[in-house]
Amino acid sequence: MEQKAEILNSGEKYLVGARITIDAPAAKIFSFIANPHNHAKIDGSKMVKGRMVGPQKLKLGSKFYMRMRKGLPYIMKNMVVEFRENELLGWKPLAQNTWRYELKQLSDGSTEVTQWMDGRKAPKILMKREITWADKAIAKTLVNLKRIIEAKP
C-alpha cells in the first residue's frame, strides 16, 4: 500500500508543511532526524546530497553544512534555532526560513510527525519559489522517514 503524508493548509502563504503518523516512539524518530548525516537519506526534494559537515547529534545552537544541488551544486550553512528533545527540531539556513520538525507521541505508541518550512520571517523574494515546491517535498520526506523508521528494528 502506498503511503502518503497529509499536506497541511496553514492559512499563511509562507508557512507550508505536511504531517504523517509513524509507528514508532518519538525518541526513535527524533534520534534519526537529530543526526543531520541522515537528512540526505530522507530528503524529498532530492536537493540534499549528503557529505554533511557537522555534529552527529544536533542541539540548540549547532551549526551544520549540507551539500546541496538545485541546478548547480552549493553548500548550505544551517543553525539549530529550536530544540526540545524528542519533540521539536528547527534550523535556519542563510535564507532565514526555518525548517522545523514537530513530534507528538500518541497513546498507541506511534508518533505524529509534522514538518514545516516557515518563511514568514525570511525575505519574501527568496521564498516565492520555495513555497511552490516545499509542501510536496516535505510530504515526500515524511514518507521516506516513515519507510526507514518502520523498517528499522
Regions from the PLM with identified roles:
Residues 92-140, 145-147:
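Beta-strand/loop substructures that line and gate deep hydrophobic ligand-binding cavities in soluble
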Residues 28-30, 60, 74-76, 101, ...:
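Short acidic, gly/pro-rich beta-turn/loop elements at beta-sheet edges
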Residues 50-96, 112, 140-153:
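Glycine-rich portal/gate segments that line the openings of hydrophobic small-molecule binding cavities
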Residues 37, 41, 121, 146-153:
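Secondary-structure transition/hinge residues
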Residues 23-26, 83-86, 106-108:
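Short loop segments at secondary-structure junctions
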Residues 18-20, 76-82, 98-105:
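Hydrophobic/aromatic beta-strand elements that line small-molecule binding cavities or substrate pockets
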